[in-house]
Amino acid sequence: MTRSASATAGLTDAEVAQRVAEGKSNDIPERVTRTVGQIVRANVFTRINAILGVLLLIVLATGSLINGMFGLLIIANSVIGMVQEIRAKQTLDKLAIIGQAKPLVRRQSGTRTRSTNEVVLDDIIELGPGDQVVVDGEVVEEENLEIDESLLTGEADPIAKDAGDTVMSGSFVVSGAGAYRATKVGSEAYAAKLAAEASKFTLVKSELRNGINRILQFITYLLVPAGLLTIYTQLFTTHVGWRESVLRMVGALVPMVPEGLVLMTSIAFAVGVVRLGQRQCLVQELPAIEGLARVDVVCADKTGTLTESGMRVCEVEELDGAGRQESVADVLAALAAADARPNASMQAIAEAFHSPPGWVVAANAPFKSATKWSGVSFRDHGNWVIGAPDVLLDPASVAARQAERIGAQGLRVLLLAAGSVAVDHAQAPGQVTPVALVVLEQKVRPDARETLDYFAVQNVSVKVISGDNAVSVGAVADRLGLHGEAMDARALPTGREELADTLDSYTSFGRVRPDQKRAIVHALQSHGHTVAMTGDGVNDVLALKDADIGVAMGSGSPASRAVAQIVLLNNRFATLPHVVGEGRRVIGNIERVANLFLTKTVYSVLLALLVGIECLIAIPLRRDPLLFPFQPIHVTIAAWFTIGIPAFILSLAPNNERAYPGFVRRVMTSAVPFGLVIGVATFVTYLAAYQGRYASWQEQEQASTAALITLLMTALWVLAVIARPYQWWRLALVLASGLAYVVIFSLPLAREKFLLDASNLATTSIALAVGVVGAATIEAMWWIRSRMLGVKPRVWR
């Protein structure tokens, strides 16, 4: 084992205590996430819950419990959001920036495993195969030590480390053993510096969420005048008693609030999370499902995303004139079996040639970075070496030129040769006889090609970026069907506009630094692209955080998993199309659901305004002011089968239609005209059926029932057009909703509990006639709207 002069038995307990007191310990700042209390407050104290909560208290004050059924929505809205966010928080909190590595720390008091936060400056940390480097340091002992820094730099090849070399936190040992002295701890360590920029809690962009918030804000402005007018007219002009006035007032205000829209959106996202969870895909922010469906550029990190860790033997090219009695396959299998600490290349050879001949080893020479070869002397089977062709061969030889030609294609080439002396001889390997060229390539994920083909069909462009050399990146991209010249990122322009223009001309980029990955994301976003970034290393963290959607591999660095919105726990790139599919389902279905809820809001506001204006006009004209037609129970049952249950089913249904921008415009061009028709039709029926404030209780109930019949007919027709294009289950849903109301009106107990009376044939006939006219108007509007938006109207799929 090579030791540096600085290798020691480690720190004393007093030296450790002194460094802790001086703040020179490995305290890593925790990632900032919302606390449980903040999550609860954010989901309970919402604008909608506040409005509904006040109205619920008012209704309960009247003693009418059945009219307070809408209060259940407050609980449902809050619980679903809290459960999902707390679940994501718990997952995030488990993903520490440096991970749960337990380094083996050597001190004068003894050598034992310790937590990463126990490490202090100048500690001696021992390393073996698979160990993670938890802090930056300097190698003080090494025995054929090779470090994989791909999570930090993107460079796929393991790096041989000698005494005095630097090792960085976030890398890990591939082969060999050694020890290093901690030179940078805590926030000074390389991985911690990158992670610090990704430590703040952020929310992914969401057109659905932003659009719904804009709509809710607009509705709030409408609620104020409509609500004040309703409160005044129902409490101070109708003179029917405070309980009846309060119930009518609440009956007017409750349906104005699209309370179920937020609930159904949360449910649709939550179900998407569960479905993707079954595919080993962790969604850490609900709207990330939607975001990936809108992505038009995917920046895919090569190492760890498109390729797997390790190498694969793709070809063994035997050289002319290398006649030996031993077969090349037997020699390679014997070499692999004799290597106690195989590096990535020898592991690939062992996988390809897994039937060793059982030769007896006479001498063994492990791989060293200084010599670039390893070898074994076998009893009765000669001396064999394998290593870099440019070291073992004459550069002018045919074999050397052949190896150079293959290497120029982005492949790794090793020379298998017979040596003239034993491998442990001072002059080893002596004169070598070339026998074969062993060609290795990075393992491409078996599902990567299929996934990239899917994105191509969906008009999503893919940019392959890596810290590896450009030739290697280009070779992998070419194997995956992404043809074109690869660019060395060291030649990329620094200006955002120039960089964006360059990105349009190239598909693959090598030698990309972490800050350049972030700059690439920013440049693409500046040209209006929605960018997804996939990666698994600490070097990907900054780009993952700033991309519209960050996707990390489950086997990647804890830092990359912590900042990504989506984590592929099974490391399968092919999971992404399923995420896109879930996003499309959410977007398409929530758009349908939003049409239903906002139509209800429009007709509720309009009906309240019409009744309120009539009350104001009636006072100077000495006419009876109108009571609002509905009590809270009426609007509750009206929502059951025209909105609530159908919306729930529609929000979960399969839907693979492409996502397009313009959510608010499309929804409002349906909801506003449909809502106006329903509001006017309901008001006309009620006006015709209303018998005045001195009417009997039965007559008032008949007028309210007539208005409800018209509302149900027109609202059901809105459901019928929103559910198009029909499939058998959508048509069945519409028919079942209509049948449910027929059953309610047919059952005496239901009529009694829900305050319904359709026994007056005159008012009921008026309600039916106006309902038919309203439904026909909605049908005509649907056809006209489709033409105006340039969409072909389809009744059947």
Curated annotation (Swiss-Prot):
<dbReference type="InterPro" id="IPR044492">
    <property type="entry name" value="P_typ_ATPase_HD_dom"/>
</dbReference>
<keyword id="KW-0067">ATP-binding</keyword>
<feature type="transmembrane region" description="Helical">
    <location>
        <begin position="703"/>
        <end position="723"/>
    </location>
</feature>
<keyword id="KW-0460">Magnesium</keyword>
<dbReference type="Pfam" id="PF00702">
    <property type="entry name" value="Hydrolase"/>
</dbReference>
<dbReference type="InterPro" id="IPR023214">
    <property type="entry name" value="HAD_sf"/>
</dbReference>
<feature type="transmembrane region" description="Helical">
    <location>
        <begin position="633"/>
        <end position="653"/>
    </location>
</feature>
<feature type="transmembrane region" description="Helical">
    <location>
        <begin position="254"/>
        <end position="274"/>
    </location>
</feature>
<dbReference type="GO" id="GO:0005524">
    <property type="term" value="F:ATP binding"/>
</dbReference>
<dbReference type="InterPro" id="IPR018303">
    <property type="entry name" value="ATPase_P-typ_P_site"/>
</dbReference>
<keyword id="KW-0472">Membrane</keyword>
<feature type="transmembrane region" description="Helical">
    <location>
        <begin position="215"/>
        <end position="235"/>
    </location>
</feature>
<keyword id="KW-0106">Calcium</keyword>
<feature type="transmembrane region" description="Helical">
    <location>
        <begin position="55"/>
        <end position="75"/>
    </location>
</feature>
<feature type="transmembrane region" description="Helical">
    <location>
        <begin position="667"/>
        <end position="687"/>
    </location>
</feature>
<keyword id="KW-0109">Calcium transport</keyword>
<feature type="active site" description="4-aspartylphosphate intermediate">
    <location>
        <position position="301"/>
    </location>
</feature>
<dbReference type="InterPro" id="IPR008250">
    <property type="entry name" value="ATPase_P-typ_transduc_dom_A_sf"/>
</dbReference>
<keyword id="KW-0547">Nucleotide-binding</keyword>
<feature type="binding site">
    <location>
        <position position="303"/>
    </location>
    <ligand>
        <name>Mg(2+)</name>
    </ligand>
</feature>
<keyword id="KW-1133">Transmembrane helix</keyword>
<comment type="function">
    <text>P-type ATPase involved in specific uptake of calcium.</text>
</comment>
<feature type="transmembrane region" description="Helical">
    <location>
        <begin position="729"/>
        <end position="749"/>
    </location>
</feature>
<keyword id="KW-1278">Translocase</keyword>
<feature type="binding site">
    <location>
        <position position="536"/>
    </location>
    <ligand>
        <name>Mg(2+)</name>
    </ligand>
</feature>
<feature type="transmembrane region" description="Helical">
    <location>
        <begin position="764"/>
        <end position="784"/>
    </location>
</feature>
<dbReference type="GO" id="GO:0005886">
    <property type="term" value="C:plasma membrane"/>
</dbReference>
<dbReference type="InterPro" id="IPR023298">
    <property type="entry name" value="ATPase_P-typ_TM_dom_sf"/>
</dbReference>
<dbReference type="GO" id="GO:0016887">
    <property type="term" value="F:ATP hydrolysis activity"/>
</dbReference>
<keyword id="KW-0406">Ion transport</keyword>
<dbReference type="InterPro" id="IPR023299">
    <property type="entry name" value="ATPase_P-typ_cyto_dom_N"/>
</dbReference>
<dbReference type="GO" id="GO:0043231">
    <property type="term" value="C:intracellular membrane-bounded organelle"/>
</dbReference>
<dbReference type="InterPro" id="IPR036412">
    <property type="entry name" value="HAD-like_sf"/>
</dbReference>
<dbReference type="InterPro" id="IPR001757">
    <property type="entry name" value="P_typ_ATPase"/>
</dbReference>
<dbReference type="GO" id="GO:0005388">
    <property type="term" value="F:P-type calcium transporter activity"/>
</dbReference>
<keyword id="KW-1003">Cell membrane</keyword>
<comment type="similarity">
    <text>Belongs to the cation transport ATPase (P-type) (TC 3.A.3) family.</text>
</comment>
<protein>
    <recommendedName>
        <fullName>Calcium-transporting ATPase CtpE</fullName>
        <ecNumber>7.2.2.10</ecNumber>
    </recommendedName>
</protein>
<dbReference type="Pfam" id="PF00122">
    <property type="entry name" value="E1-E2_ATPase"/>
</dbReference>
<feature type="binding site">
    <location>
        <position position="301"/>
    </location>
    <ligand>
        <name>Mg(2+)</name>
    </ligand>
</feature>
<keyword id="KW-0479">Metal-binding</keyword>
<keyword id="KW-0813">Transport</keyword>
